[in-house]
């Protein structure tokens, strides 16, 4: 009985072998798709991706418990508007008395320097013929010729007054300027209320004169006094221009 199925299989195999030998390929029809398999195990982590864009800032956090250290000082601001003056304070206590001038060494040194500078200046001007010294008086001229009133103003601005001789030595010193500039000069005398009565600028009578022969002869019309190149005097109208000579 078992030989019949076996013979059938051999026949089928022989027939199949004949077909395969001819085409060398066994072609079957596609089967029906099977059911999906179960999920496999999770795979390994992939590589890191590219860096993304920064996200938006988060909300401000709560204040910290530790205070921050103070920052550096800022730049100075612009000056403010000056305030109103305060009330005058009470006078301070009276200071100790100063030393007498002759005991103050610093003051004496300063005065010594001043004297030295003055003497140097006087010496330099004397060499130039700009000043003449007689006793305690210093006579000086700038060589300009102006009216009597203008000379008085110029000498006052310089801290002196118009030159006036009170003795022969001073008269000779003034005459030296008259000779140098070869022009007459006014002296500090003016005629008083009475004709021919000439006085000093302070109104005191003249105690020294050197009038030219026959002078004064203006009889009240010539109220100033000019000096000639020989040192003699003549009364003259005050509106003429004469050499400026001052005394200090």
Curated annotation (Swiss-Prot):
Glycans are attached at residue 207. PROSITE patterns: C_TYPE_LECTIN_1, C_TYPE_LECTIN_2. In presence of calcium ions, it binds to surfactant phospholipids and contributes to lower the surface tension at the air-liquid interface in the alveoli of the mammalian lung and is essential for normal respiration. Enhances the expression of MYO18A/SP-R210 on alveolar macrophages. Pulmonary surfactant consists of 90% lipid and 10% protein. There are 4 surfactant-associated proteins: 2 collagenous, carbohydrate-binding glycoproteins (SP-A and SP-D) and 2 small hydrophobic proteins (SP-B and SP-C). Oligomeric complex of 6 set of homotrimers. Interacts with CD93. (Microbial infection) Binds M.bovis cell surface protein Apa via its glycosylated sites; probably also recognizes other bacterial moieties. Residues 31-101 are annotated as: Disordered. Residues 42-51 have a biased composition (Basic and acidic residues). Residues 1-20 form the signal peptide. This is Pulmonary surfactant-associated protein A1. One of its GO terms (cellular component) is collagen trimer. Disulfide bonds join 155-246, 224-238. GO terms for molecular function: carbohydrate binding; lipid transporter activity. Residues 28-100 form the Collagen-like domain. It comes from the Eukaryota. InterPro entries: C-type_lectin-like, C-type_lectin-like/link_sf, C-type_lectin_CS, CLec_Tetranectin-domain, Collectin_CTLD, CTDL_fold. Its main location: secreted. Keywords: Acetylation, Calcium, Collagen, Disease variant, Disulfide bond, Extracellular matrix, Gaseous exchange, Glycoprotein, Hydroxylation, Lectin, Secreted, Signal, Surface film. N-acetylated. It is found in: Secreted; Secreted, Extracellular space, Extracellular matrix; Secreted, Extracellular space, Surface film. Changing residue 225 to M: In ILD1; uncertain significance; impaired secretion. Belongs to the SFTPA family. Residues 54-70 have a biased composition (Pro residues). It is linked to Interstitial lung disease 1: A form of interstitial lung disease, a heterogeneous group of diseases affecting the distal part of the lung and characterized by a progressive remodeling of the alveolar interstitium. The disease spectrum ranges from idiopathic interstitial pneumonia or pneumonitis to idiopathic pulmonary fibrosis, that is associated with an increased risk of developing lung cancer. Clinical features of interstitial lung disease include dyspnea, clubbing of the fingers, and restrictive lung capacity. Respiratory distress syndrome in premature infants: A lung disease affecting usually premature newborn infants. It is characterized by deficient gas exchange, diffuse atelectasis, high-permeability lung edema and fibrin-rich alveolar deposits called 'hyaline membranes'. The modification 4-hydroxyproline is found at residues 30, 33, 36, 42, 54, 57, 63, 67, 70.
């Amino acid at each position: 009985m078992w030989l019949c199925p076996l013979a059938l299989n051999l026949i089928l195999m022989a027939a199949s072998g004949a077909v395969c030998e001819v085409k060398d390929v066994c072609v079957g029809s596609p089967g029906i798709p099977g059911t999906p398999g179960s999920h496999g195990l999770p795979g390994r982590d992939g590589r890191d991706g590219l860096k993304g864009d920064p996200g938006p800032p988060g909300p401000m956090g709560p204040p910290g418990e530790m205070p921050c250290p103070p920052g550096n000082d800022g730049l100075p601001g612009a000056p403010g508007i000056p305030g109103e003056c305060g009330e005058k304070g009470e006078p301070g206590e009276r200071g100790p008395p100063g030393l007498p001038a002759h005991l103050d060494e610093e003051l004496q040194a300063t005065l010594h320097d001043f004297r030295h500078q003055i003497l140097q200046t006087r010496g330099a001007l004397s060499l130039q013929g700009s000043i003449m010294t007689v006793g305690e008086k210093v006579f000086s001229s700038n060589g300009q010729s102006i009216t009597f009133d203008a000379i008085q103003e110029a000498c006052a601005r310089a801290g002196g007054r118009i030159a006036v001789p009170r003795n022969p030595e001073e008269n000779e010193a003034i005459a030296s300027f008259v000779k140098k500039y070869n022009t007459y000069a006014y002296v500090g005398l003016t005629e008083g209320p009475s004709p021919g009565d000439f006085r000093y600028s302070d109104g005191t009578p003249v105690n020294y004169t050197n009038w030219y022969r026959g002078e004064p002869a203006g009889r009240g019309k010539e109220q100033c006094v000019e000096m000639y190149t020989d040192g003699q005097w003549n009364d003259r109208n005050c509106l003429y221009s004469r050499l400026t000579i001052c005394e200090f």
